[in-house]
Amino acid sequence: MSEIVAEKLIDIKSVQFSFNKHFTLTSGLKSPVYVDCRKIISFIDERDFIMNEAVEYFKKNNLNFDLVAGGETAGIPYAAIISEKIKKPMLYVRKKSKGFGKNQQIEGSFKEEQRAILIEDLATDGGSKVIFVEAMREAGLAVKDIFVIFYYDIFNFESSVLGKLNVKIHSLCTWKDIISVM
């Protein structure tokens, strides 16, 4: 499964290389490789395949949750599709509250202690996910799992910020899968 997802990412040119001018990742790290999972939303067949694989992954790994939460902004379309496929309510989490209106960081309806899975497009070192997990927990949600389509998987997870938050990161494919199909 993971190698097929990797092939799909390569086919739609989500995997890009730039050896002269490195990409700056969300983590601040520089990389000659950039995986742009946001492109998936524009490719219907590939998107449908990948989202179906996500649903199968949840079943095979017995992930238990009551709500699907999309992280602003890249996680929102995938959370919406997954939520629809598995018939579970959806939320979305902002990086920070809007500062006007109801000044909410989390949109959607939920109850304290409900279990939520955070959906994002990808993760490098997981640092940007901390904001979402902390906001969800502060709101009373139980968060122990994060699901991403692509995970670089090049850092020691246990010593990472997410490892210290006691959350598990799940992915459909990693950098090793991309390399194995190139």
Regions found by a protein language model. Give the residues of each.
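Active-site-facing substrate-recognition patch
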Residues: 1-63
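PRPP-dependent phosphoribosyltransferase catalytic core
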Residues: 2-12, 134-182
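Conserved hydrophobic/aromatic pocket- or pore-lining residues that grip, position, or stack substrates
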Residues: 28, 68, 90
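Short, well-ordered alpha-helices that flank and scaffold nucleotide-derived cofactor binding pockets
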Residues: 56, 80, 84, 134, ...
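Short glycine-rich phosphate-binding loop at a beta-alpha junction
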Residues: 63-72, 147-148
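Conserved acidic residues
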Residues: 66, 114, 144
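Short, glycine/charge-rich flexible loops or terminal/linker lids adjacent to PRPP-binding catalytic cores
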Residues: 78-117, 125-130
